Amino acid sequence: MTVPASTAPQVPPQQDPQVPHPQEPREEPHEEPPSPPAAPRPQSRGADTRALTQVLFGQLKGLQPGTREHERVRGALIEANLPLVRYAAARFRSRNEPMEDVVQVGTIGLINAIDRFDPERGVQFPTFAMPTVVGEIKRYFRDNVRTVHVPRRLHELWVQVNAATEDLTTLHGRTPTTPEIAERLRISEDEVLSCIEAGRSYHATSLEAAQEGDGMPGLLDRLGYEDPELAGVEHRDLVRHLLVQLPEREQRILLLRYYNNLTQSQISAELGVSQMHVSRLLARSFARLRSANRIEA
């Protein structure tokens, strides 16, 4: 049997399954990474160091020296004030010495200043410590640093020559000769002599030290000295130049008084005038000489 098309069950049209569209990823709000804290300004660091130093000295005052806590606080004071040492050491950069060595020496001065500082005197610690630190560094250069620059190779060779000299002195019971040192180190005698000469530049020679050779005077004995008569020669030459400007009688009175060492009474007898008149003539001569000297000057 044929079913009319109108009455045939209608098959619903198949619909394509809807595929869900992928959702657009949400943009998270962009957050800037936190900026690092600004470095403290030098003035701020200095103020912090001063404040910390003041607190540490307050703690140190109530502690027994030699105890573990005392050493801890003392070490913190040293650490906090090392920038002061570096600042002082930087003033000596031109000395061609390793800066680490200079800082170590300055640290000794810092420790001495810490041990001597009294907070109750009302003085800031940097003000108190700086002269001690600088003084320690200057003492180091004065006592340990050579006065003349020595090439590095010659300096290293000098150390070897010095060690060989000590060994040979112990071995032979006497100071070794230059050839013995040269043979020991396998270097030339000229190099040994150069090293010995370079070694002398490490320390200044005392003016009172005896020189090589028997009976040789020290440097101080060979230095010239100022002859006390030189000033007298200069004065006499000046007076002679001014004296010719005086009247002849006044010239004679001055010569009798100061060159012949006569008294005023002796001069009055020599010239046949009163002692009072001699005194007035001397005073007048001095006034004229002073006036002439001012004009010459």
Curated annotation (Swiss-Prot):
Short sequence motif Polymerase core binding: positions: 101-114
Region spans: Disordered: 1-46
S-S bridge residues: none
Composition skew (Pro residues), residue ranges: 10-22
Ranges annotated as DNA-binding: 264-283
Keywords: DNA-binding, Sigma factor, Transcription, Transcription regulation
Full protein name: RNA polymerase sigma-F factor
Lineage, highest ranks first: Bacteria, Bacillati, Actinomycetota, Actinomycetes, Kitasatosporales
